[in-house]
Amino acid sequence: MDPTGIFDLPNTSLIFWEVVTFLILLALLYRYVYPIIRDQIQKRQAQIEQAIEEAEKTRAEARELLEEYRRQIEAARGEARQILDEARRQAKAQRERAREEAREEGDRIIQRAREEISRERDAALREVRREVADMVIMASSRVIGRELDAAEHERLINEALESLEAEVAGGRTA
């Protein structure tokens, strides 16, 4: 056992001076080192806060840009839809015009063909009339044995033509 005390404590004067030295060291650290550390921590905190603010600004700008790009993309899609719709309308109108022109051309061709057929039929009828008239004149000259005058020729021709037209008209309706 130690003669200085019950709990074997070291010399109290030594403890006292250790505590005083520790407090002086703390005071010196607080006075000279702590402000430097505090300033460095505050600077670092300010830098971090500034970086966070800049990151938030950048994020906000990125969101705005993203929204702007989305609006532009949607506008471009709308414009593309309008262009496609207009192209479809124009193609449909062009097809309709082509159909109408083809229909009109077909009608014109049919009309020209009908007119040509009518002209050919009229020419054929005139030719038939002329030949019939010639045959009637020859036949009547032989039957009568004499030449007919112009009025008699005209009368016989008209009778033959009326007979022929009646037969042709009867053939058309049958």
Swiss-Prot record:
Q: Any idea where this protein resides?
A: Cell membrane
Sorted alphabetically, the keyword list is: ATP synthesis, Cell membrane, CF(0), Hydrogen ion transport, Ion transport, Membrane, Transmembrane, Transmembrane helix, Transport
Extract one GO cellular component term from the record.
proton-transporting ATP synthase complex
Topology with regard to the membrane?
Single-pass membrane protein
Among InterPro entries, the record links this protein to: ATP_synth_B-like_membr_sf (IPR028987), ATP_synth_b/b'su_bac/chlpt (IPR002146), ATP_synth_F0_bsu_bac (IPR005864), ATP_synthase_B_chain (IPR050059)
Q: What is its main location?
A: membrane
| GO MF, any single term | proton-transporting ATPase activity, rotational mechanism
Note the superkingdom of the native organism.
Bacteria
Spans traversing the lipid bilayer: 9-29
Which PANTHER family would you find in this protein's record?
A: ATP SYNTHASE SUBUNIT B, ATP SYNTHASE SUBUNIT B', CHLOROPLASTIC
Q: Quaternary form? A: F-type ATPases have 2 components, F(1) - the catalytic core - and F(0) - the membrane proton channel. F(1) has five subunits: alpha(3), beta(3), gamma(1), delta(1), epsilon(1). F(0) has three main subunits: a(1), b(2) and c(10-14). The alpha and beta chains form an alternating ring which encloses part of the gamma chain. F(1) is attached to F(0) by a central stalk formed by the gamma and epsilon chains, while a peripheral stalk is formed by the delta and b chains.
Q: Which NCBIfam families match?
A: ATP_synt_b
The entry sums up its family as follows: Belongs to the ATPase B chain family.
> What is the role of the protein in this entry?
F(1)F(0) ATP synthase produces ATP from ADP in the presence of a proton or sodium gradient. F-type ATPases consist of two structural domains, F(1) containing the extramembraneous catalytic core and F(0) containing the membrane proton channel, linked together by a central stalk and a peripheral stalk. During catalysis, ATP synthesis in the catalytic domain of F(1) is coupled via a rotary mechanism of the central stalk subunits to proton translocation.
Protein known as: ATP synthase subunit b
User: Mind giving the lineage of the organism this protein is from?
Assistant: Bacteria, Bacillati, Actinomycetota, Rubrobacteria, Rubrobacterales
